[in-house]
Structure formats: structure tokens, C-alpha cells
């Protein structure tokens, strides 16, 4: 189906240890609009979508896992040299007590990932509109992370991710039009 290369989809650099920024980035790791939710949503929906757009959901769903890997790398690099005191001051004390430096799927507020973040209606057009909304929410979150970040190296990677969300949204919009045209061909008056 795909080939894994032992490199990130886009390079991730950070300027300095910054557990506070890592805490915010965790939103895209285990939050409702994050990369894990997107990957699982798209790969699940592909089983009830017409053949014409299955490949799109597969391609974007697997790319979301590459984005998840980038976010994990960012969080790791931003926290790898942090002391327990720095983690506590950044609001990651609860995380440290439960997971030490291990990543865990939760949002920036510490709420664990849940399947309720994922939607699959079974109506292909409805599901694609859900996917468009998911991509637009992710795009907005990446913009807000860029706005709050003071790390120019990290912002480069965040801009890459933001732009990929825009591309995904556009591709899902194209898929909606394909399915609408197909649906309209079947109407008999």
C-alpha cells in the first residue's frame, strides 16, 4: 500500500527546550482536531465510500500518520532536556507524573484521546464534508500555534503542516463534486 522511509515528511527543527510550546502542540497529537483523529477518521471512512475516492482517503489518511510523527518529534525535541520542574511550570506536571517523558494521546488540556473525536456517517458526501471541516479546523489550529510560537525553526514545520491541511481540504472538496456529479447522473425525473 505504501512504503515507509526512515525520515520525516518534512524536517523538524526546534531552537530551544520549550515545554510550554510542547504542551500546546500536544493538541495536534491527541486532540479532537489533531492528526491521530484525522488519520483514523479517513482510513475508517474509506470502507463505505465509492471506489472513485477510496484512494484519496487512503492517501490522506496515511499522510496524517506522517504528520502525527512530525508532531511527536516536535514535542519530544521541545521537552527532551526539560527538568521535572520545567514540565510542571509548563502545565505538564500531570503528564510527567503519569508518563514521564513518554508521549501519550491527549489534548493540550490533558483530556485523553477518545473515539468520539471520529465521525463516520456512512453517507459519502456527509463524511467528506466532515473531512473538509476537520482539515479546516486543523489548519486554524496550526495557524494559532504559529501565532503563539516564538520558535522560528519550529514555525517552518508548522507552516508546512498548515499548508498540507489546505491541500487536503481542497482535495476533499474536489471529491465532493465528483460524488455529487455521480449522484446527479442517477436521478430520474
Curated annotation (Swiss-Prot):
InterPro entries in the record? Ferritin-like, Ferritin-like_SF, Mn_catalase, Mn_catalase_dom
Q: Taxonomically, which superkingdom?
A: Bacteria
Read off the CDD domains from this record: Mn_catalase
Under Pfam families, the record lists: Mn_catalase
Family classification? Belongs to the manganese catalase family.
The protein's role, per its UniProt record: The cotJ operon proteins affect spore coat composition. They are either required for the normal formation of the inner layers of the coat or are themselves structural components of the coat.
Q: Write the protein's name.
A: Protein CotJC
Q: Which organism is it from?
A: Bacillus subtilis (strain 168)
The lineage, from the top, is: Bacteria, Bacillati, Bacillota, Bacilli, Bacillales
Encoding gene, per UniProt annotation: cotJC
Amino acid at each position: 500500500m505504501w512504503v515507509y522511509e526512515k525520515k520525516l515528511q518534512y524536517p523538524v527543527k526546534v531552537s530551544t527546550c520549550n515545554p510550554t510550546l510542547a504542551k500546546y502542540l500536544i493538541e495536534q497529537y491527541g486532540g479532537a482536531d489533531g492528526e491521530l483523529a484525522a488519520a483514523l477518521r479517513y482510513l475508517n471512512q474509506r470502507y463505505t465510500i465509492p471506489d472513485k475516492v477510496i484512494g484519496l482517503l487512503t492517501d490522506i489518511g496515511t499522510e496524517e500518520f506522517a504528520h502525527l510523527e512530525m508532531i511527536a518529534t516536535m514535542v519530544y525535541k521541545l521537552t527532551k532536556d526539560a527538568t521535572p520542574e520545567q514540565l510542571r511550570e509548563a502545565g505538564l506536571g500531570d503528564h510527567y507524573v503519569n508518563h514521564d517523558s513518554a508521549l501519550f494521546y491527549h489534548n493540550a488540556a490533558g483530556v485523553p484521546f477518545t473515539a468520539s473525536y471520529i465521525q463516520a456517517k456512512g453517507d459519502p458526501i456527509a463524511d467528506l464534508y466532515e473531512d473538509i471541516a476537520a482539515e479546516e479546523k486543523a489548519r486554524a489550529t496550526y495557524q494559532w500555534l504559529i501565532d503563539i510560537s516564538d520558535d522560528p525553526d519550529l514555525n517552518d514545520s508548522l507552516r508546512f503542516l498548515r499548508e498540507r491541511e489546505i491541500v487536503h481540504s481542497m482535495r476533499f472538496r474536489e471529491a465532493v463534486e465528483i460524488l455529487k456529479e455521480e449522484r446527479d447522473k442517477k436521478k430520474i425525473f
